[in-house]
Design a protein with these regions (language model features):
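DNA polymerase processivity clamps
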Residues: 1-77, 84-190
Length: 190
């Protein structure tokens, strides 16, 4: 929780989420542990949300519920800024049409290989936008051709965990940016 610029950043070590535009009642950076409390329906549906802080704790009040998180003073948050660069640094962008985004979010779970380690898919961004998947027992590849979507920039073929692609879609992103096939994909909504 970055008080100086009103930024909330979170990571699980594989994915990062940075949201800005918050007014926090402190000016320094505060690291708190991850918690599953925010997936609770009563917390997500809260109308009134407020924050408070003591020397050792952050308090988040969501309607009648309060979550207390102990400040982790001896730990540091990873420098994730390098992994969420400016859009201009992308060599390729996958632009998803709304209909294709909805379709991909639902279909990705049914593609082969969903239960394999890292739930892999290949994003083949050439003349078309194609999502490819194959299970270990399968000899042929299954293709999802997203006819209403397009690629901007260079042609690219990149492997990804399908759940990361789905998470981006569920967060409302319709542009996935790539610097190259080895760098992490990123989305921005500035």
């Amino acid at each position: 929780l970055r008080g100086a610029d009103g930024q909330i950043a979170a990571t699980d070590g594989q994915q990062a989420l940075v949201q800005t535009g918050f007014t926090l009642p402190w000016t320094d950076d505060v690291l708190v542990p991850a918690t599953g409390a925010f997936v609770a329906k009563v917390i997500r549906a809260a109308v009134q949300v407020s924050l408070g802080r003591s020397t050792d704790w952050i308090f988040i009040r969501a309607d009648e519920w309060t979550v207390a998180l102990q400040i982790e003073k001896d730990r540091r948050f990873p420098a994730i800024e390098a992994h969420v660069p400016e859009v201009s640094s992308a060599s390729t962008t996958m632009v998803l049409a709304e209909t294709d985004a909805t379709f991909l979010d639902q279909a990705a779970q049914r593609l082969p290989g969903a239960s394999e380690m890292n739930s892999p898919v290949t994003l083949d961004l050439n003349g078309a936008v194609v999502i490819r998947a194959k299970s270990g027992e399968q000899s042929s590849v299954t293709d999802l051709v997203l006819r209403n979507s397009r690629r901007q920039g260079d042609e690219l073929k990149v492997s990804s965990n399908r759940e990361y692609v789905r998470r981006a879609i569920q967060l409302g992103f319709r542009e996935l940016h790539f610097r190259d096939a080895e760098a992490p994909a990123f989305c921005r909504d500035d």
